[in-house]
Design a protein with these regions (language model features):
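Conserved ATPase-coupling elements of RecA-like P-loop NTPase cores
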Residues: 68-74
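GG-anchored amphipathic helix commonly corresponding to the ABC/SMC/Rad50 NBD signature/C-loop
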Residues: 37-58
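Amphipathic coiled-coil/heptad-repeat helices and related helical stalk/stem segments
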Residues: 43-44, 74-77
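Flexible loop/turn segments at secondary-structure boundaries
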Residues: 34-36, 67-68, 99-102
Length: 138
């Protein structure tokens, strides 16, 4: 996890630490930082380490995990996600607000997009589940 952390935070940010306490117990934390973004970063780096170091064929992440992580770090993560294909592995990523990122990040996203969902006809299964009249039913 430290190697990945050093890639996404080259300015020497503390990396998460995994402590195996027993065969049924562990902790994963970043020393001196328990913010939401740091916790999400720790989970992402753990997932990437497992993806890169084991036979696990794929991981899936949602945009919520990236929402509290800096743009620079997110763009570095996108590159790490992309490099996983060199290992014949896949990353499934639900990503929104792509326009907020650099042209390079958007190019990387475009090259790797398999499915793009949006309103007005690009909904999964062709319909938006949240449209319709409100009901008083509970």
């Amino acid at each position: 996890m430290r190697e990945f952390n050093n890639i996404i935070y080259p300015d020497i940010s503390k990396s998460p630490q995994l402590n195996l306490k027993a065969h049924y117990s562990y902790s994963c934390h970043t020393p001196d930082d328990d913010s939401t973004g740091t916790k999400f970063k720790g989970m992402i780096l753990y997932d990437l380490a497992i993806l890169y170091l084991t036979n696990l064929p794929a991981i899936a992440h949602i945009s919520l995990l990236l929402s509290n992580i800096s743009y620079q770090a997110t763009e570095a993560l996108l590159k790490l996600y992309d490099q996983s294909k060199l290992l014949n592995k896949q990353v499934f990523l639900a990503f929104d607000k792509a326009r907020s990122y650099s042209p390079d990040a958007n190019q990387l996203l475009s090259e790797n997009t398999v499915l793009r969902l949006s309103s007005d006809g690009n909904e999964l299964y062709g319909i938006s589940w949240n449209k319709g009249e409100n009901s008083d039913e509970v």
